């Protein structure tokens, strides 16, 4: 997956630097997923890179018969779980950091749990959130939407809920 992405970026470097939705010229499955997720969330395709790569890795595991597996790519998680699991959230300096976990029931298929932060990690952030976590069966979509919400989040702003209508994302 990473080699596919790197080869595409070598041919189309703008794909890697735009903060806006972008339609690639060609590219494979990972590139297509990133671009589609970015269009849905209104962000550039690289906002979905960690989720898309984790998803590709989990697909390989599931394709080999894994019924339980987790890939955590810097807070962007792809998982398949035949048992209940708990997923904690590290939110940097927030007083809520490492103090709670999401409890996920056993489930069929691959699921995405992606967290984006303005205070943890090297990503460019246009917002103020310590952690925004988004769940979706489309791992790239969860990653892109977590980034989009983090970028827009301002103290006291409650407009974001309207953006999720009809997207397949739960936040």
What does each model-identified segment do?
Residues 1-171:
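Mature catalytic core of soluble alpha/beta enzymes
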């Amino acid at each position: 997956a990473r080699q596919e992405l790197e080869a595409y970026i070598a041919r189309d470097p703008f794909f890697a630097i735009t903060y806006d939705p972008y339609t690639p010229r060609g590219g494979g499955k990972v590139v297509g997923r990133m671009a589609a997720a970015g269009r849905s969330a209104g962000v550039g395709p690289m906002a979905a890179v960690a989720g898309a790569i984790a998803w590709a890795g989990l697909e390989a595991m599931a394709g080999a018969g894994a019924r339980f597996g987790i890939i955590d790519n810097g807070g962007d998680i792809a998982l398949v779980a035949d048992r209940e699991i708990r997923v904690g959230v590290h939110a940097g300096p927030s007083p809520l950091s490492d103090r709670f976990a999401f409890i996920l029931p056993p489930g069929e298929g691959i699921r995405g749990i992606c967290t984006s932060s303005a205070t943890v990690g090297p990503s460019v952030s246009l917002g103020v959130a310590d952690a925004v976590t988004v769940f979706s069966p489309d791992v790239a979509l969860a990653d892109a939407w977590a980034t989009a919400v983090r970028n827009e989040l301002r103290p006291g702003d409650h407009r974001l809920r309207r953006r999720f209508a009809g997207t397949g994302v739960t936040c």
